[in-house]
Design a protein with these regions (language model features):
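Short conserved motifs of the RecA-like P-loop NTPase core
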Residues: 1
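Leucine/isoleucine-rich amphipathic helices and adjacent mixed helix/strand linkers
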Residues: 5-164
Length: 164
């Protein structure tokens, strides 16, 4: 039973890829050589992310590196706050918090939200394995960015008064 889920995941990610094809010819070409392993499928999802406009690509990459480097599962709100933190600011700008649906839609099917726990996570444990193998080269400044964001967040004025 455990081996069945990755096959459905592979099919779902392939369907997501086909949905982005602009012409029938592009769909036919993609159907001629469907990805037969998850690593290739994840590579193709990353290519779809790379083809987005700069703002969307950067946000998707930030979502992916925050989730893949997190030492514990993050709630949607935690990730939204992390992504909204701006260097040098003394408080969180509520207008800079990205929408939950945007966070998942930009990530080419690689990220889902568990509606019961409100945890935003990678779609499958194999996705985490994939990112474990590529994240250092794919997101070279991620750990520095995460550390900087955490330090900025902890230095917000709201924490100076001891009320949070």
């Amino acid at each position: 039973m455990l081996n069945i889920y990755p096959r459905f995941l592979l099919a779902q990610l392939h369907m997501d890829s086909l949905a982005t094809k602009g012409t029938r010819k592009a769909v036919k070409e993609a159907l001629k050589s469907p990805p037969n392993d998850l690593s290739r499928t994840y590579d193709e999802a990353m290519q779809r992310i790379e083809s987005q406009n700069d703002d969307d690509r950067q946000l998707a990459e930030r979502v992916l590196y925050w989730i893949s480097y997190a030492l514990r599962p993050l709630t949607v709100e935690e990730l939204q706050h992390a992504l909204a933190v701006e260097p040098g600011e003394s408080k969180l700008d509520e207008d800079n918090i990205p929408d939950e649906e945007l966070l998942t839609s930009l990530c080419a099917g690689l990220v889902i939200v568990d509606k019961e726990s409100n945890i935003i996570r990678l779609v499958h444990y194999t996705t985490q394995e994939y990112f474990n193998s590529i994240r250092a080269s794919r997101f070279p400044g991620a750990q520095t960015s995460i550390a900087s964001t955490c330090l900025t967040y902890l230095s917000f004025e709201v924490f100076a008064d001891g009320y949070y």
